[in-house]
C-alpha cells in the first residue's frame, strides 16, 4: 500500500482516484500530478513501482499544499479575517453564512439546530 502525505492510498483504485483521498487534491490536481510525475493515470496503486511512488511524492511536495499544511493555512486565514473585524470575519465569528446567502429562512446547516421559542411563565391568578 502506497503511503503519500501521511495517507494510505487504496490499493485497488486507479492512481488518479487514489490521490483524491489526500485532503487538498481533487480530480484536476490528481491528473496534473500524474502528468508531471510521468505516471499513467489508469495505473492501479498496487502496480506502481517504488520509483513512480517517489516521483509522485516529490511532485506533491513541490507543487501542492496538502493535508495538515493546507488545513493550518485555511484556519489561519479564517482567524486573520476574524482578528481584522471585517464583515467576513464577523460572519465566521457568529457562525453565519459568509458568502451572502439569505438567513431569514434556510442556512440551517451553518446556524445549527433551531432554538425553541421560550415563553414567559403565566402570571399567577389574582386573589
Curated annotation (Swiss-Prot):
Protein's UniProt keywords contain rRNA-binding: yes
Keywords: Ribonucleoprotein, Ribosomal protein, RNA-binding, rRNA-binding, tRNA-binding
PROSITE patterns in the record: RIBOSOMAL_S13_1, RIBOSOMAL_S13_2
Annotated segments matching region Disordered: 95-127
InterPro entries with a match to the protein in the record: Rbsml_uS13_C, Ribosomal_uS13, Ribosomal_uS13-like_H2TH, Ribosomal_uS13_bac-type, Ribosomal_uS13_CS
GO BP, sorted A to Z: translation
Keyword Chaperone included in the entry's annotation: no
GO MF annotations, alphabetized: rRNA binding; structural constituent of ribosome; tRNA binding
Compositionally skewed regions (Basic residues) per UniProt: 95-118
TM spans (from-to): none
Top-level taxon of the source organism: Bacteria
One cellular component term from this protein's GO annotations in UniProt: small ribosomal subunit
Signal peptide: none
Disulfide bonds: none
HAMAP family with a match to the protein in the record: Ribosomal_uS13
Family the UniProt entry places it in: Belongs to the universal ribosomal protein uS13 family.
Subunit structure: Part of the 30S ribosomal subunit. Forms a loose heterodimer with protein S19. Forms two bridges to the 50S subunit in the 70S ribosome.
UniProt function note: Located at the top of the head of the 30S subunit, it contacts several helices of the 16S rRNA. In the 70S ribosome it contacts the 23S rRNA (bridge B1a) and protein L5 of the 50S subunit (bridge B1b), connecting the 2 subunits; these bridges are implicated in subunit movement. Contacts the tRNAs in the A and P-sites.
Protein's recorded name: Small ribosomal subunit protein uS13
Protein source organism: Anaeromyxobacter sp. (strain Fw109-5)
Lineage of the species this protein comes from: Bacteria, Pseudomonadati, Myxococcota, Myxococcia, Myxococcales
Amino acid at each position: 500500500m502506497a503511503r503519500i502525505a501521511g495517507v494510505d492510498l487504496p490499493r485497488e483504485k486507479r492512481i488518479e482516484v487514489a490521490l483524491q483521498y489526500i485532503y487538498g487534491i481533487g480530480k484536476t490536481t490528481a491528473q496534473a500530478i500524474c502528468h508531471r510525475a510521468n505516471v499513467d493515470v489508469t495505473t492501479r496503486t498496487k502496480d506502481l513501482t517504488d520509483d513512480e511512488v517517489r516521483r509522485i511524492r516529490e511532485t506533491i511536495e513541490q507543487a501542492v499544499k496538502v493535508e495538515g499544511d493546507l488545513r493550518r493555512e485555511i484556519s489561519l486565514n479564517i482567524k486573520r479575517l476574524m482578528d481584522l473585524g471585517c464583515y467576513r470575519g464577523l460572519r465566521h465569528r457568529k457562525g453565519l453564512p459568509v458568502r451572502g446567502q439569505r438567513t431569514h429562512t434556510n442556512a440551517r446547516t451553518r446556524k445549527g439546530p433551531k432554538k425553541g421559542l421560550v415563553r414567559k411563565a403565566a402570571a399567577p391568578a389574582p386573589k
